[in-house]
UniProtKB/Swiss-Prot annotation:
The gene is sat. Belongs to the sulfate adenylyltransferase family. Pathway: Sulfur metabolism; hydrogen sulfide biosynthesis; sulfite from sulfate: step 1/3. It comes from Pelotomaculum thermopropionicum (strain DSM 13744 / JCM 10971 / SI). It catalyses: sulfate + ATP + H(+) = adenosine 5'-phosphosulfate + diphosphate. It is an enzyme of class 2 (transferase). It comes from the Bacteria. This is Sulfate adenylyltransferase.
Length: 383
């Protein structure tokens, strides 16, 4: 039996047929709000059910409960605010109970929102609670501080879907991945979230998960990330070359997660798990410093946060892993749970050192990354 969506029902707010045509007509007479890429991706992920049980951008009660208690107003576990900012000038044209058209930055109509409420909020409080810092150098905090003056809550409907030019076949809705897992006969599905190329340490975690699950769902985030993160197209090439050569084809499935990266560390780990549950996963891999950035979070804070919730509240099983490394004496990948040897036997490379090597055209050691993956990255850094 497939895992139930979060909240019990997979949301579908994508308009089709006559309902879509009618919405297109209404939109011509409505006030227009322009969404940036982050908000547009949230709109689509609400509509296709990835953010179930949300049916729209959060109202004040849900927003404040999520910020303070990591739950929606009805008690459902939810850790990240999903909100739509609106400037004071725009707010004047809106009224509760009325609709507004939601448009992309280039003016394309994306959908509609039925305005429930327009409310003020405390940016600093959100930063402290959600990101554990008020430092504007944190990319998530910076985003909060730059957001518009008010927030707009209300149910949405999606009219137009924007498919990217790159790897459109990888963009699947939760209803589609759930069907695929069922067709494959997978009852236990381990999901893996990543915004980086997969190196040997990640490969080790994935194969450990595959030992206890029927299938592996590799679901890289391909929405907005930091400017110095490896671009999605390069990462997808890395994923394809690794999975095709070092994993059984019938036990792994690769699909894109078109969300923006929040860099909210522990809270985002829970959020990522819930979303993958909606995609049909039963287990979720949580490694060292999941969704972290800089030194804002402890190495295993993203695992400890799960202690705040009962297993039945989450409905997905987290798989916690220690930081993995190659041990020369063991002759393979290990962690401090399985390896008795000292630091001199362990191959560790910092991200900074790896980028320096790749930029210089040097191949990182095989103990750190597969040669095929390194070759893709060397070509990218050589540009």
């Amino acid at each position: 039996m497939a895992v139930k969506p979060h909240g019990g029902t997979l949301i579908d707010r994508v308009l089709k047929g006559p309902a879509r045509e009618e919405a297109l007509k209404r939109a011509k007479e409505l006030p227009r709000l322009f969404l940036d890429r982050w908000e547009a991706s949230d709109l689509e992920l609400i509509a296709n059910g990835a953010f179930s049980p949300l049916a729209g951008f959060m109202n004040k009660a849900d927003y404040e409960n999520v910020v303070d208690n990591m739950r929606l107003a009805d008690g459902t576990v939810w850790t990240i605010p999903i909100v739509l900012g609106v400037a004071s000038g725009e707010a004047g044209s809106l009224a509760p109970g009325r609709e507004a058209a939601l448009c992309a930055e280039d003016g394309e109509l994306l959908g509609l929102i039925k305005v429930e409420e327009i409310y003020d909020y405390d940016r600093r409080r959100e930063a402290e609670k959600v990101y554990k810092t008020t430092d504007e150098a944190h990319p998530g905090v910076k985003r909060v501080y730059e957001r518009a003056q008010y927030l707009l809550g209300g149910e949405i409907s999606l009219i137009s879907r924007r498919r990217p030019g790159q790897f459109p076949e990888m963009y699947l809705d939760p209803s589609e991945t759930r069907r695929i897992f069922a067709e494959k006969g997978w009852k236990r599905v381990a999901a893996f979230q990543t915004r980086n190329p997969i190196h040997r340490a990640h490969e080790y975690l994935l194969k450990c998960a595959l030992e206890i699950c029927d299938g592996l769902f590799v679901n890289p985030l391909v929405g907005e990330t930091k400017s110095d993160d490896v671009p999605a197209a390069v990462r997808v090439e890395c994923y394809n070359v690794l999975l095709s050569r070092y994993f059984p084809a019938d036990r792994v499935f690769l699909s894109a997660f078109p969300a923006a990266m929040r860099y909210a560390g522990p809270r985002e780990a829970v959020f990522h798990a819930i979303v993958r549950k909606n995609y049909g996963a039963t287990h979720f891999i949580v490694g060292r410093d999941h969704a972290g950035v800089g030194s804002y979070y402890g190495a295993y804070d993203a695992q400890l946060i799960f202690d705040n919730f009962e297993p039945e509240e989450l409905g997905i099983t987290p798989l916690f892993f220690e930081h993995a490394f190659y041990c020369r004496t063991c002759g393979g990948m290990a962690s401090r749970k399985t390896c008795p040897h000292g630091g001199e036997d362990r191959v560790f490379l910092s991200g900074t050192r790896v980028r320096e090597m790749l930029s210089a055209g040097e191949m990182p050691p095989e103990e750190f990354t597969r040669r095929e993956v390194a070759e893709v990255l060397v070509r990218y850094y050589a540009k």
